[in-house]
């Protein structure tokens, strides 16, 4: 696993001049460096750049992520002079929550306004099975919109605007944990940090956007999710889902050992070209080779599997023949297959497969020796179910031609 660190990419914030109980805000005209989302190595470099000892990075990271503290004045094991210096030059500011909804089934959704006024969403899904010991899974967004244009996904219909910064990605997790320290309608500024507890147990990079097309900020965020000084999640509890950006799959395999999920949705190239257009660039043979490399070649003694995500579309990809093709495609790849009932959205050209059809499809996979689950739809009453993360924004079907043309350069950078 590579330990190379990227240069510091500071997230400069302009925030209003008022100070609150737990989140210190600064003058609009004064740009400050947001420390949220910096890895320990990046933060150590930042401290060296301001003439401080790099070990301070560990102290500050623990305050931010283990105690939820964003006001430097409350970081009591830092010297007064350092606290003053940080207050003058830095900040810890998660993205602004402009809307939140709590579903009847316990699902929570937040709409964030990020720099520039764009909106993104994140969803927290609590397990409803007592055997799962209170598991709470956060579905995190990595981009504003998505450029991949999967034909069955409502999120893609708003087009792509920009990548999220590491602060905007990791801030989603910070806010989700903070929500358990406040009442439903209370401000995050009223968090009692003495009661802080990191309630989120699992993170899936499955929200808005393709994570591997925003590679460095996503990897930096996941490093902090795994760090014992920050959130301390185990590798099997952090999952990155990709539609198949093959070069970045190889890069990730060398750098960060997290769980991998593949948004497959079709067992042959002809159908996947229609449903998941990136398949035209990286067809199934290349995708499966990258998946096998991730499981077998990097650390063959470490038992891993790939999660295969497969949305069930009535009369499109749900026949017995499709199931048999999927069995042949996966072969000996250690896989857990997650069948996802389609969640309809306005002007969708697809329907949900019947329950009988989904179960028949599942039975073929199970009989072939694969672990196969059928995802329970959660949060659909607040438009938080899979494929519904479209945000409360205008439909942006006219995608950025410049972005589309730059994908190749970004993948190979």
From Swiss-Prot:
Binding site for S-adenosyl-L-methionine: 209-210, 241, 263-265, 343
Task performed by this protein: Specifically methylates position 2 of adenine 2503 in 23S rRNA and position 2 of adenine 37 in tRNAs. m2A2503 modification seems to play a crucial role in the proofreading step occurring at the peptidyl transferase center and thus would serve to optimize ribosomal fidelity.
Cofactor dependency: [4Fe-4S] cluster
Upper classification of the organism: Bacteria, Pseudomonadati, Pseudomonadota, Gammaproteobacteria, Moraxellales
Radical SAM core domain span: 132-381
Active site as annotated: 121, 386
Gene from which the chain derives: rlmN
InterPro entries for the chain: Aldolase_TIM (IPR013785), Methyltransferase_A (IPR040072), RlmN_N (IPR048641), RNA_MTrfase_RlmN (IPR027492), rRNA_lsu_MTrfase_RlmN/Cfr (IPR004383), rSAM (IPR007197)
Protein source organism: Psychrobacter cryohalolentis (strain ATCC BAA-1226 / DSM 17306 / VKM B-2378 / K5)
UniProt: [4Fe-4S] cluster binding residues: 146, 150, 153
PANTHER family tied to this protein: 23S RRNA METHYLTRANSFERASE, RADICAL SAM CORE DOMAIN-CONTAINING PROTEIN
Protein known as: Dual-specificity RNA methyltransferase RlmN
Any GO MF annotation of the entry: tRNA (adenine(37)-C2)-methyltransferase activity
First-listed, main subcellular location of the protein, grouped into a coarse class: cytoplasm
Entry's localization field: Cytoplasm
